[in-house]
Amino acid sequence: MPNSLIADAVARIRNGQMARLREVTIYHSRVLVEIAALLKEEGYIVGYEVIEIRPSVKRIIIRLKYYCGQPVISKLKLFSRPGKRIYSRACEIPKFYGGLGISVLSTSKGILPSYKAVSSNCGGELLFGVY
């Protein structure tokens, strides 16, 4: 099991997009389910499904999205990692790719995209950016 489930999930999604895979499998956690739901809501993935391999062992299957043969996710950049956490107040949340992409934050209100965190005046840990 990797040290950071979020970093592992971001790497698997990025590698799956570069290899033009239809779906990737990532480890299961409540945070990763919230992240998958957010990516689906924002239109970056087709969908996700939680499967149970055996009792108490679950995985998340993420179906990747393509448009005209090109991946919808062109950049996926990890901000925080276990050795260096990056926190931001609501007024200081950076724009990812000049506002074309979104930054994903872990806040007290759950996992939120940058524009929802700013509108609800809620800062938190910057997890990754997607464009």
From Swiss-Prot:
Keywords: Ribonucleoprotein, Ribosomal protein, RNA-binding, rRNA-binding. The keyword Ribonucleoprotein applies. Gene3D superfamilies: 3.30.1370.30, 3.30.1490.10. InterPro entries: Ribosomal_uS8, Ribosomal_uS8_sf. GO terms for molecular function: rRNA binding; structural constituent of ribosome. The gene is rpsH. SUPFAM superfamilies: Ribosomal protein S8. It comes from Neorickettsia sennetsu (strain ATCC VR-367 / Miyayama) (Ehrlichia sennetsu). The lineage of its organism: Bacteria, Pseudomonadati, Pseudomonadota, Alphaproteobacteria, Rickettsiales. One of its GO terms (cellular component) is ribosome. Belongs to the universal ribosomal protein uS8 family. One of the primary rRNA binding proteins, it binds directly to 16S rRNA central domain where it helps coordinate assembly of the platform of the 30S subunit. Part of the 30S ribosomal subunit. Contacts proteins S5 and S12. It comes from the Bacteria. Transmembrane segments: none annotated. This is Small ribosomal subunit protein uS8.
